[in-house]
């Protein structure tokens, strides 16, 4: 009887722990993460203080923090080829990373690290040198900077059948040396790495290539890492937020459902379907049942995004910054509709899949520069600084914990809906104007459309909408308007 009771208690503790790993530990009503892809730590610290904190962003996903192989031309993907767990990359060193985490936490912006637990680097002729000066022999699976030897890896094999679980989880993803997460030594080094980041004050982790690791092995690792550091403002016994990269199009042998109890999961179907809709391949009217009605994961288990650093580089339905009008409409819908744990992308310009981040002649990443309106100008795209996007982060904060109501559509590509009595969104993706009275659900008053302008010193620099005592307002979105979306909320009342 005692053994049974003890087993039940252990199961309850494990279940409680995994549920806690779905909590992003946001400040107040903040609820949007931004991925500052390839930014330097010092620049992220400054961005937290000058822009992200004041604009109400909840957190930052940062690029991998540990030492990586140096590849010719310095493509972005070299960051995903580790050779040690030393915290030295082109983004900065450990001291700069720790300073960034502290400064961002101080202004209510949490840090989530993109971590590489699945693999080390790919093949390299001879001795490879890393960003911290460590040497490795990838062809021999020798990484003295950890240290790892060939005994710590799965046998070399290629993934040729994505419906073969063994290949997916024990062969080499695009030639990257595949770690054996069932090994006690490998587990100990991964846990040590994650614990060090927790000690420095991070709030959680984006787990790269999670589907290529057995869920049982990840469960062991997650349950073995430390609670968050209370010296950085986290409560006692708080568990790291975990969101896992699991690409599952609905017909995968290794499915997202194997991982969603361990932490949140990247909902790639969201990205694909929202791109289809706003590219005009699917009528917006069907978005009324968006979320679980489309076969997506439960809201609290889904990390949602319009694009990410990988799929924005692929041809297909996924939207990116190169289709700005549709991208801004999709992002507005993403942040207005009550589904998922939202992340927005902040990119650098690219012409091909391998383009390096903006860098100088010595191949050092350069800092973003801004024009007089705050937009980036020197190779950084900085979608998070587009007014239409950061304004919707504010919208999402203003309407947090409200329900969707009063859905309207024209049977095609014009839609609107309310978020409680705090927010209203309208979208026009037709080739003709949207001009009509619509229920906004807002209290009577005059509201600034935060898409076309900003509320500054009591005046709106863009469109304004007068809402009557019954909640109705006249909404106009021309087919040739710069933006095909209009957004009102209670914090933008004139």
Swiss-Prot record:
Question: Disulfide connectivity?
Answer: 48-104, 157-171, 376-382, 418-441, 448-460
What keywords is this UniProt entry annotated with? Answer: Calcium, Carbohydrate metabolism, Chloride, Disulfide bond, Glycosidase, Hydrolase, Metal-binding, Pyrrolidone carboxylic acid, Secreted, Signal
Q: Where in the chain is the site Transition state stabilizer?
A: 310
The record's Pfam families line, in alphabetical order, gives: Alpha-amylase, Alpha-amylase_C
Signal peptide region: 1-20
Q: List the catalytic residues.
A: 208 (nucleophile), 245 (proton donor)
Spell out the SUPFAM superfamilies in the cross-references.
(Trans)glycosidases (SSF51445), Glycosyl hydrolase domain (SSF51011)
The organism sits in which domain of life? Answer: Eukaryota
* Subcellular location, record wording: Secreted
Would the keyword Phosphoprotein turn up in this protein's UniProt record?
no
Cofactor binding note of this UniProt entry: Binds 1 Ca(2+) ion per subunit. Binds 1 Cl(-) ion per subunit.
Matches recorded under InterPro entries: A-amylase/branching_C, A-amylase_C, Alpha_amylase, Glyco_hydro_13_cat_dom, Glyco_hydro_b, Glycoside_hydrolase_SF
> In its UniProt record, which GO terms are filed under biological process?
carbohydrate metabolic process
GO MF entry, a single one: alpha-amylase activity
Cofactor names from the entry are:
Ca(2+); chloride
EC number in record? 3.2.1.1
Enzyme class, top EC level, equals hydrolase
Q: Which family does this protein fall into?
A: Belongs to the glycosyl hydrolase 13 family.
Q: Which PANTHER family match?
A: ALPHA-AMYLASE
Q: How does it assemble?
A: Monomer.
Q: What is the protein name given in its UniProt record?
A: Alpha-amylase-related protein
């Amino acid at each position: 009887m005692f053994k049974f009771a003890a087993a039940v208690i252990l199961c309850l503790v494990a279940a409680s722990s995994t549920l806690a790993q779905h909590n992003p530990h946001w400040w107040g009503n903040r609820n949007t993460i931004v991925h500052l892809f390839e930014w330097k730590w010092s620049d992220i610290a400054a961005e937290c203080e000058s822009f992200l904190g004041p604009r109400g962003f909840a957190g930052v996903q940062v690029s991998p923090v540990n030492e990586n192989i140096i590849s010719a031309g310095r493509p972005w993907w070299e960051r995903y080829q580790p050779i040690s767990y030393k915290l030295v990359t082109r983004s900065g060193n450990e001291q700069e990373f720790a300073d960034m985490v502290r400064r961002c936490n101080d202004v209510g912006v949490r840090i989530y690290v993109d971590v590489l637990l699945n693999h080390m680097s790919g093949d390299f002729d001879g001795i490879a040198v890393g960003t911290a000066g460590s040497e490795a022999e990838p062809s021999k699976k020798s990484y003295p900077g950890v240290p790892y030897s060939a005994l710590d890896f799965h046998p070399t094999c290629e993934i040729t059948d994505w419906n073969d679980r063994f290949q997916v989880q024990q062969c080499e993803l695009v030639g990257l040396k595949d770690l054996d997460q069932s090994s006690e030594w490998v587990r100990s080094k991964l846990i040590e790495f994650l614990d060090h980041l927790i000690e420095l004050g991070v709030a959680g982790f984006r787990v790269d290539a999670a589907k290529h690791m057995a869920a049982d092995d990840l469960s062991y690792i997650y349950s073995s890492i430390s609670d968050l550091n209370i010296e950085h403002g986290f409560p006692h016994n708080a568990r790291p937020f975990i969101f896992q990269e699991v690409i599952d199009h609905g017909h995968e042998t290794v499915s997202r459902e194997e991982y969603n109890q361990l932490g949140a999961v990247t909902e790639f179907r969201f990205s694909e379907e929202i791109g289809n809709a706003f590219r005009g391949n699917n009528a917006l009217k069907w978005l009324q049942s968006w979320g679980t009605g489309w076969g997506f994961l439960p809201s609290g288990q889904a990390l949602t995004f319009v694009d990410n650093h990988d799929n924005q580089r692929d041809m297909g339905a996924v939207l990116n910054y190169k289709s700005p009008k549709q991208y801004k409409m999709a992002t507005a819908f993403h942040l207005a509709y009550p589904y998922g744990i939202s992340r927005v992308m902040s990119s650098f310009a690219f012409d091909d899949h391998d383009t390096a981040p903006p860098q100088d002649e010595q191949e050092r990443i350069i800092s973003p520069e801004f024009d007089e309106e705050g937009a980036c100008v020197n190779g950084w795209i900085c979608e998070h600084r587009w007014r239409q996007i950061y304004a919707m982060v504010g919208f999402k904060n203003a309407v947090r914990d409200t329900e969707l109501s009063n859905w309207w559509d024209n049977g095609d590509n014009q839609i609107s809906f309310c978020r409680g009595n705090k927010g209203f969104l309208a979208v026009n993706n037709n080739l003709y104007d949207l001009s009509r009275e619509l229920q906004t659900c807002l209290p009577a008053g005059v509201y600034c459309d935060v898409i076309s302008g900003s509320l500054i010193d009591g005046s709106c620099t863009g469109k304004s909408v007068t809402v009557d005592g019954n909640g109705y307002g006249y909404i106009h979105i021309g087919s040739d308007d710069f933006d095909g979306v209009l957004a009102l909320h209670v914090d933008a009342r004139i």
